[in-house]
Amino acid sequence: MFAVMKTGGKQYKVQAGDKLRVELLAAEAGEAVQFNEILMLGGDNVTVGAPLVEGAAVQANVIEQVKGAKLIHYVKRRRKHSSQRKKGHRQKLTLIEITDILASGGDKSGMKTAIGAGMVAVAAGAVATAAVVATKAAKKAKDAKDEAPKAAPKAEKKKAAPKKAKAEAAPAAADEGTRPANLLDAARDGKADDLKKISGVGPKLEGLLNENGVYHFDQIMAWGPSEIAYMDDKLSFKGRIERDNWIEQATAFAAEQE
């Protein structure tokens, strides 16, 4: 009776008593292992799996862990310049001896399943990776929890900000000044003074003053600091009234008219 089994990505035709080398198994010398991937059973009755034969198994003993043969690569050249060197990778293998072939009941034998050492390494790596990911996630959650109380004072400071804004708004409102009481809807007797005489006042600025009720020099000369601040802010003069001494100029021009 023979069987075709699969291990390490390769297929082997075996029968009881055979010794063969297979891809490295995760087993020690002297251990008994069982191969459960059976593709075909032969003998008096041939059974072909679809793709595996259900319940079939091949049992074997591990003799030793070995390496592949050393290969010598020989390069022949002319005039005694030939060379040779050891070449290639020495694959790690497991030498086993087939002890029995089971046509059925292999899934209930209780014998250790033959697993490739590479599969064990991959599984161990996956477990280690999962552990690292879990540790990082736990640390991240802990850090977030520790930082949560620190974020609370910032929120309180943000709530306190409107009070400060209100406190700053009060002086700003005070700096806007008081609207002059002598602003007019139209020039007296329909004749406005020539405000362009004031330094820095042109036709455009004169028109702007007229639109805001300023037509005469005596209106400007009567303004106090509060009224000056109001008109300066209203007309966006940026301190021009005080900088160009409008009050003194208006006083002089008003005196000339008298």
UniProtKB/Swiss-Prot annotation:
Query: What superkingdom does the record give?
Result: Bacteria
The keyword Ribosomal protein belongs to this UniProt entry's keyword annotation: yes
Which GO molecular function entries does the Swiss-Prot or TrEMBL record give? rRNA binding; structural constituent of ribosome
Checking Pfam families in the record gives:
Ribosomal_L21p
| Ranges of Basic and acidic residues composition bias in the record | 140-159
One GO BP on record is:
translation
Question: Where would you find the membrane-spanning parts of this chain?
Answer: none
Q: Which InterPro entries match?
A: bL21-like, bL21-like_sf, Ribosomal_bL21
Q: Which Gene3D superfamilies match?
A: 5' to 3' exonuclease, C-terminal subdomain (1.10.150.20)
**Which region is the signal sequence?**
none
Q: Where is this region: Disordered?
A: 140-181
Identify the keywords attached in UniProt to this record, alphabetized: Ribonucleoprotein, Ribosomal protein, RNA-binding, rRNA-binding
Specify whether rRNA-binding is a keyword of the entry: yes
GO terms for cellular component: cytoplasm; ribonucleoprotein complex; ribosome
**Purpose:** This protein binds to 23S rRNA in the presence of protein L20.
- Which NCBIfam families does the annotation name? L21 (TIGR00061), PRK12278.1-1 (NF008915)
Q: Which PANTHER family match?
A: 50S RIBOSOMAL PROTEIN L21, LARGE RIBOSOMAL SUBUNIT PROTEIN BL21M
Subunit relationships: Part of the 50S ribosomal subunit. Contacts protein L20.
The entry's family comment says: Belongs to the bacterial ribosomal protein bL21 family.
- What is the protein's name according to its record? Large ribosomal subunit protein bL21
